[in-house]
């Protein structure tokens, strides 16, 4: 994956020129976004267990029928697997924040996820609800800076849209 820095420098070199003010502003913007992503990744990692638990609890509160016999969360083992899956998605979002792209989610979280859930008769709606709760609950400056929160929410939206 080419970075903005590599792209800008390569274009300037190909044109045989120094970096322009616009080039430098693009690089600076990229560095600022990277700093925001790293802040979001750090905050998410520090609170992963709490975020996962709150998201899962919100999901099971909204979809309480899931704990009824024959449903996706009818045993503690199945409930624990739901929390595990939520933690997995949040961990992949953490990786995306660090690398600055959706590659980890695309490769390890989304590709085939809907088909797997469908084949196991697991609804994706509760996962969407849990991740939506996380997105809507997060707030700046309580949780992280506004720019970091924007980066975090963009990856939450990406997963929500993929599972919807």
UniProtKB/Swiss-Prot annotation:
It comes from Synechococcus sp. (strain WH8020). It is found in: Cellular thylakoid membrane. Belongs to the phycobiliprotein family. One of its GO terms (cellular component) is plasma membrane-derived thylakoid membrane. This is C-phycoerythrin class 1 subunit alpha. Its main location: membrane. One of its GO terms (biological process) is photosynthesis. The gene is cpeA. CDD domains: PE_alpha (cd14769). Heterodimer of an alpha and a beta chain. (2R,3E)-phycoerythrobilin 1 binds at residue 82. Light-harvesting photosynthetic bile pigment-protein from the phycobiliprotein complex.
């Amino acid at each position: 994956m080419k970075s903005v820095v590599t792209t800008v420098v390569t274009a300037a070199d190909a044109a045989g020129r120094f970096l322009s003010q616009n080039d430098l502003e693009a690089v600076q913007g990229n560095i600022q976004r990277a700093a925001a992503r790293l802040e979001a990744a750090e905050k998410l990692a520090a609170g992963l267990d709490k975020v996962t638990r709150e998201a899962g609890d919100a999901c099971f509160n909204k979809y309480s029928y899931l704990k009824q016999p024959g449903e996706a969360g009818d045993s503690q083992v199945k409930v624990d697997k739901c929390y595990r899956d939520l933690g997995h998605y949040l961990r992949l979002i953490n990786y995306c924040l660090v690398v600055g792209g959706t590659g980890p989610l695309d490769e390890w979280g989304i590709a085939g996820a809907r088909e797997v859930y469908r084949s196991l008769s697991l609804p994706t709606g509760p996962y969407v609800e849990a991740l939506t709760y996380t997105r809507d609950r997060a707030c700046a400056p309580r949780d992280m800076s506004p720019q970091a929160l924007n980066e975090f929410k963009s990856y939450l939206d990406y997963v929500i849209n993929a599972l919807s």
